[in-house]
Amino acid sequence: MEKKTVSVVMCTYNGEKYLREQMDSILAQTYPIHEIIVCDDCSTDGTMNILQEYATKFPFIKVHRNTRNKGCNQNFHDIFYQVSKKVDYIAISDQDDIWFPEKIGKLVQLIEKEEGYNLCFSDIISSPTYSRQQTKDYLPLPFTAESLF
């Protein structure tokens, strides 16, 4: 059976603090990644330098920079139009997420196991170096389009 292809999309804005760690965690996935597409929203820190460094080393990383700041929602909306038409799944990444190596493999396995799944997500585990709280099941299950938006 042929493996499903996965593209990762990430939007950035002044994300240099955790960006290297996140890029490394995506590259360390045990499941193959078809492409990584990053769209920067006019960062003023070293984000673009880091992204260009990774794109030079790994040709399947495509980096785009907006000509004007669009904001998070519009940036994510637009990035989906840059994904290759040949991929089966799109994984959404934030610039400060650090993924476990098996994340994509487990999500693909789950979505393939259950007929009719169109969306799959995972909880977060916070770290002492991050200010976020750990969340559990933040969407009611089963959820509907109305509960998502």
Model-identified regions with their sequence ranges:
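Nucleotide-sugar donor-binding/catalytic module of glycosyltransferases
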Residues: 1-149
